[in-house]
Amino acid sequence: MERGTTLVTEASAPIEAHTDEAQTPPSVFDVAVIGSGPAGSQSAVSAAHQTRSVLVIEAGAVSQRKGRAFWSKSVEFQDAPVFPGITGPRLATALSAWMSAQVGRMVTIGGKPRHVGIWRRGGMVLRVTRVEPDEGVHAPAGYLFAIEASTGALKAGTELTTERFLARSLVVASGFEDIWPDIDVTEGADRLYQTHRILFRYAGNRKGWHVCIRCDGHLHLDEHIAVVASGDFAWSIARGAQDFTGHITILTNGADPDFSDARLETLAARNIEVITEPIAAHIGKGTDLLGLKLSSGREVFADGFFVDYGLKANSEYLASNDGWNLKTDDEGLLVVDEDGAVLGADGNAVPGLFAAGDIVAGQRNLIATAFGLGQNAGLSAADLMREW
């Protein structure tokens, strides 16, 4: 999953605890988690396991917006913990079942009733703000997180269906969007997956587009790999590809290659061609991507196509005009401390705010890494609830 994600089509059911008998959720959750990929799921399970009430808000439940792993439609991950091989959709199903096992319910601990477990809600988070708690409401961060989410269909000309949730802590696990090259785009489309519908036909298949050389390079042992990128992105993929093959071609799609003389010499010594022509169209059969047609009419064929055009962090709901001033890297990913707490621009941890998975700066964007970061953030959020 190196380099993930968390559009809205239909309304979801009210909050449920995923039991035979619906359990009433708390008015204020101990932990809210935005995102239900490996990092979000692990955060939720870890916090629930520590007897906390957890709300998971899942964009994919009400939209076409899916995490990077989900789009591996026919390619099996072989480095996901426990599974010898599993596709993205099957992994998503397994994560869902895992969270559902942490039933939202009431328990009594030390004579005091407490909500514990996981409640899940389909929704696209629009805004997160900090609000003062009502008198008597436990707020270990000094405030509560108010989360506004669209929980109904997004249709032109209709008002948003929104709901507001409150939590004592928040784990951001919404990942990022991969930026895709403009090849065979559908002009006038207003959604990402409509704009790139032809490209997505070939995404996540063995003979198709890949976004992670560490994850999918093994599919093309000693085969021809095409790298569609430029600059550091292209260099990183090409260096990774050498572990799997010696047959590599770089296509910059009209961009300046942006390689130093030393890098160009290294590529030339290994017979790696750098093609700077713009790419005009896909050459495919069914869901298999066979090659790319260039603007000159030249056709370049390969067995696998690895792309990197950068990313867009899914953290727009933490807007500066709502009082958020967070520390990020150059790509907008959140900087955290050793406990998974998000840092403010001043370098200090923001009380109650944590992050995990691909949204975190400076981490390997891999499934196992996401699980580890998720557990760290989930446990840190859970520990914040302790009275002493």
Region locations from a protein language model:
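Beta1-alpha1 glycine-rich phosphate/pyrophosphate-binding loop at the start
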Residues: 3, 31-34, 38-101, 229-258
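A charged, well-structured terminal subsegment
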Residues: 374-388
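Rossmann-fold dinucleotide-binding core
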Residues: 205-228, 234-244
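A Rossmann-like FAD-binding core segment of flavoenzymes
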Residues: 7-8, 12-17, 69-71, 92-167, ...
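Helix-enriched interaction subdomains in cytosolic or periplasmic regions
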Residues: 142-149, 160-199
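Short, well-ordered coil/turn residues at beta-beta hairpins
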Residues: 35, 169-175, 180-182, 191, ...
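FAD-site-proximal beta/loop scaffold in flavoenzymes
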Residues: 15-20, 188-219, 309-365, 373, ...
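Phosphate-coordination loops involved in phosphoryl transfer and adenosine-cofactor binding
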Residues: 28-30, 122-123, 221-223
